Amino acid sequence: MLTKAFLSPAEIEERIAQEAASDKDRKLTPEQIEAIYSNGTNILVSASAGSGKTFVMVERILDMIGRGVGIDQLFISTFTVKAAGELKERLEKRLTKHLGQAETDEERAFLSDQIAKIGTADIGTMDAFTQKLVNQYGYLLGVSPTFRIMTDLAEQTLMKNEVYADLFNDYMQGKDAQLFQKLVRNFTGHSKTSKAFRDLVYDIYSFSQATADPEKWLRQNLLKGQIEAKPEQAKNELLDSLKDGLLADFLAFLRDHLGIAQREFAKAKYLNNVSDAIILLEGSLINDQTDMEDLLKQLLTLSGGTGLTNMTRPKDEELKAYKEAYNKTKNEFVAQLREVDTQLTVLEVLAKHNDDILPMLELLQSFVLDFSDQYLQAKIQENTFEFSDIAHFAIRILEENPEVAVSYRDRYHEVMVDEYQDNSHTQERMLELLSNGHNRFMVGDIKQSIYRFRQADPQIFNDKFQLFLENPDAGKLILLKENFRSQSEVLDATNGVFSHLMDQEIGDILYDKTHMLVAGSQKQKEPHPENETEVLIYNSDESSTSEDEEGPDQAISSGEISLVIKEIIKLHEQGVRFEDITLLAPNRNTYLDLMVSFEEHGIPLVPDEYKSSYLESLEVMIMLDTLRAINNPLNDYALVALLRSPMFNFNEDDLTRIAVQADKGQFYDKLLAAHTKSGLHPEVVMQGLDAKLTLFTETLADWRDYSKCHSIYDLIWKIYNDRFYYDYVGGLPRAEQRQANLYALALRANAYEKTGFKGLSRFIGMIDKIIASGNDLEEVTDLVPKNAVSLMTIHKSKGLEFKYVFVLQMNRKFIGHSKDGLSGKYIINREKGLGIKYLADLKDQINTNLPKLNVVLETLTFQENRREERRASISEEMRLLYVAMTRAEKKLYLVGKGSKETLTQQYGTNVENNRLPVAIRDQIATYQDWIMALDTAFMRKDLKFTVRFVEAEELTPEAIGQVEVQAAVDADDLSNNRQTEDIKRALTVLESVEKLNQLYAPAIDLPSVRTPSQLKTLYEPIMDTEGVDIMDKKEGVQPLETASTFELPDFGQKTKVTGAAVGSATHELMQRLILSDKVTLQDLTQALSRVSADDQVKARVQLEKLLGFFDTELGKLILANRGKLRREAPFAMLAEDPASKEDFVVRGIIDGYLLLEDRIVLFDYKTDHFTHPSELKTRYQGQMSLYAKALSQAYQMEKVDKYLILLGGKDLEVVEV
């Protein structure tokens, strides 16, 4: 095994100095070098957006492997399965490259072993690791290794409901039945079901599962806030805070006003009350003459009605404005006083009921503990578990079995975790148990922590950050702030926004120079004024937006969509490709509206992992309504849908003329009356409509007759062919996807009937049941256009980068500010536990004849939890905006909607510590309001973005524009568009042209980059043919395949082993083979075992021939010069096309060559079948010449010996070319 010492701090500093002095275009930053080579302690890398954290992780892993640490000695936790796969792929590529450059047999053997172990190394998600651990050691807890993960939500819900129902009945009939009924009623109110209580139990259970020890949390933390709540103490603290806070400010305000008002409004009656209020406040605050509670009530009495309101009518505009400003501020003070008075009343009532609340919640605690235990027992009985169960089993195994924990700690040289800011407490506990206390490497960025809904806790990262910052002995803190992604315009705008918004109060981190993004290269710093960040706001009257449309799930407005489309079309006209543009949405609710609008304007749009509803796609809905109408023409909805469809094109006017044929009855009866001119108004049935009716009634009758004696599959294809509907959708945008949907409908109908169910009626019934249940048929794989605008959520975009980014719905309200946010009957907090709204009966405290007087009271814990949850929610929204803004490489657009008048006037210029005041940031409800508040408070030069309001008049169809798309085809014209005699004659003429196109393909269809194999294929016809007499030859012309094909899976068929697969396996074997003085069959077998191919393919690799190769002169030469051997070497060179004289790049991979002092020996393995070596020598002569030319130019060496190693014949042949 290799052993190489790790760098000391002095050696790391030396490495930093060497890097700074180098002439590299892109140098490693000092912080990157520290992150790669530091060792011997826990390390936290705070990596800002685009700072190359993945690069750092890969380089650190490679450095450790280079020093003799095996890949199986590292624990590497990634956030997603995809990230783990990408990391493994990167490591394998880099290790393979290092293998080719290895100088000793020991090094080659070690690296080869590491490559082989990557697949089984502990690189993956924490869920994957805990499953592996429980598989191996679950027996210690009595868990069978054959357990199954319960991923189906329906299965989980069914099992939970069964356990809950049994337990609920037990409690309803138990010794505490009366108290339990009160508990349930507290959350269900007058509802006839206990669903609200069940939801509470499930939410507490789910929350507990995200902790390291659910049972411990339920016992110690669930009721912690309620146990510690002291309403009387809270009341006294609130009264004490009034003296130096609200009341002192109110006194100062009234004093200032009185000084001016006695001069300007001397005779106003309200001034007496103002003077009395000042006397009261001075007596209490200065002389302690009045009890605070009494003072509050007296002030509210004085301010009642218009007591403190200036009712004068000054003519002077300045005085009028002053009066209005006074009244507005006074009203705000009075509202705060009333709020305090209400809080004091609530605290008094809570103090009286506090002894009633705790026993009720203790019963809830017992219920949840019993539910958790019984639910787990039910899962154990079925040997099926949730991911959280497996994680807790793993923690228990390590905590309760020290010998197991020690074996893991001894195994891992380092415990690494990516995206550390999104760790949960369960994951953190696992990492603590796997680490030896000083070998953790954590990479993340708290500014990008956006997964609280998955129980991630950014405070875990923040605690480590503060600890390492204040106490370097506890661990090393490394900050990566250089951004290698974005241009300076994007970086400046991001810094401008967050340096004035984000701090530890809101955002959980102080965004100062330590965290500001810095351009990592000179190219990023080059100014591009046209790419300055733009805030685009669709100017709309806010009064037109109802409360129902506001909230975190509000829909995007048509104005915003039009605004975005206009900008995209403008970019497109400037030469920007659609694929360089990305839309970031807060959620997927906007997807459908965006897709419809973009399609109307001819802009291709691809949503990321959008679960499009197959049964709700327009073409499928039309076909389903067609089948419904055939099955039952009296179905008015289906019939009208079919009439309006492109197959028959009835418009609103046509339908109206049909509808007036009878006062009542089914629409089909009215249609027949219109057709036979026997209705109430036959005179309105004009000739054109009559022709449509004739076509429709005859076609429908034909389809109905056909359906009686043919399969649904045949009926569907008859509909497609009779009305050319399949061809019609082929002329629409996203044509391939639409045709795939229609094709799949026919296949699914066929599959349905093969199950034994027959008949159109039953098929429609099955589809309708699926729709009614809210489910869908499996969607057809989207045929995604390559050059298309991408659409994804901000969460999905994390870790990605795009040239042009539009952040949508900047005006969306945050959850904490929305009508439904934090307004439920309970809020759960990790530290304080459960806070509830208590249903109190105040009958005994208020004189009333009512049997009960129930009032909902917010407990102290509920109020505290709401404050914390609201602040945490706003902080995460701020981090989400940071993630969105840092995705852009070139230009960033922030798009919203609102009233220009309101947005430009509602914020002041108050600033605290160069930031918006906390109170303002805390109250702001949208990203857009943050931006506009910044725009008002700070200079534009500090913010680096521009704000532009767009009027509706600027978004007319003419102003927006249109992207040219292929016009849709009229179904009625398709019958004349078939292959007529003229087309046949034209095709005959074109055949000769096609032959010339094939002959001179290199000159006609020349790309900028080619591989040697492609060049061989392209130039073979030219090499083999002289002149143009090929025009007279009929053979050899291959028709172009343009139609989409749909292949069904062939289950059970054996994989066909192709020659190409065997060839690839052979090449990989020779690449992986560790060479020594004497190659043996065992060496070849070992190398073959590491080849990534099917066993059937490996069986076809002829090891005896390969072994014989090393007995040839060339084989011996290679073994004698192993240190000068290069294998799988990439190359690139410039070449000229002989037909067009155009330059192009040739790129490829050379199987191997020896770099000797006097010459280069080039060789290439070929597994093609041959009867005589000269065949392959001629075939590959051009390719080998290209290889030789590339090597000769690269090494400035004229002599290149070229050999083909032929493995496809009866015997192995080595042929010099």
Curated annotation (Swiss-Prot):
Entry-linked CDD domains: DEXQc_UvrD
Binding site for ATP: 47-54
Cofactor(s) the protein needs: Mg(2+)
Domain UvrD-like helicase ATP-binding: 26-487
SUPFAM superfamilies documented for this protein: P-loop containing nucleoside triphosphate hydrolases, Restriction endonuclease-like
Gene3D superfamilies referenced in this protein's UniProt entry, alphabetically: 3.90.320.10, P-loop containing nucleotide triphosphate hydrolases (3.40.50.300), PCRA, domain 4 (1.10.486.10)
A family per Pfam: UvrD_C
Gene Ontology CC, one term: DNA helicase complex
Swiss-Prot/TrEMBL keywords: ATP-binding, DNA damage, DNA repair, DNA-binding, Exonuclease, Helicase, Hydrolase, Isomerase, Nuclease, Nucleotide-binding
A GO molecular function held by the record: double-stranded DNA binding
The enzyme's E.C. designation: 3.1.-.-, 5.6.2.4
Domain UvrD-like helicase C-terminal: 515-799
Record field: catalytic activity: Couples ATP hydrolysis with the unwinding of duplex DNA by translocating in the 3'-5' direction; ATP + H2O = ADP + phosphate + H(+)
An example Gene Ontology biological process: double-strand break repair via homologous recombination
Role according to the record: The heterodimer acts as both an ATP-dependent DNA helicase and an ATP-dependent, dual-direction single-stranded exonuclease. Recognizes the chi site generating a DNA molecule suitable for the initiation of homologous recombination. The AddA nuclease domain is required for chi fragment generation; this subunit has the helicase and 3' -> 5' nuclease activities.
Subunit structure: Heterodimer of AddA and AddB/RexB.
Sequence similarity: Belongs to the helicase family. AddA subfamily.
Name of the protein described by the UniProt record: ATP-dependent helicase/nuclease subunit A
Encoding gene per record: addA
